[in-house]
């Protein structure tokens, strides 16, 4: 579980201008620099607050189902001569660890005044997790997905739509994840004032 102490340790690391240590840094296209600066400012203003931490941890537990259990794999432990445990992130709401990321990002986006969420997905797990938190936080969601991936992952497309997300088929190029990323970035570049790209 993340604590306020952990957040303060992470935030006390060198972060000015995106630098982390001697060789750290960031390189992003010019149009994305301002929204990333706004996101960094929102993160520093919102995430360390008691209000955000309490809501985030409440939602992780109540909505997400955290903490997930550990399973002691006795047979494997005996075979390998050490204790082996499996962490059951598959028991989170939605069936995957993706919720850990999307829940925090979407909550931060809402607190920062963003009005919609966009994402790209290949197999559909990230899109499904984004759709879940968008529905829970009452934020519209648009998920970009390559046409070929839509055909392969019909059940996840159904789940995203069931939760209210618009799934946009990307039909250019190889009709896969790379093209879905391009489409999502184009949407974000046009709508960055009110949109958060997960």
Give residue ranges: language-model regions:
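PLP-dependent amino-acid enzyme catalytic core
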Residues: 2-198
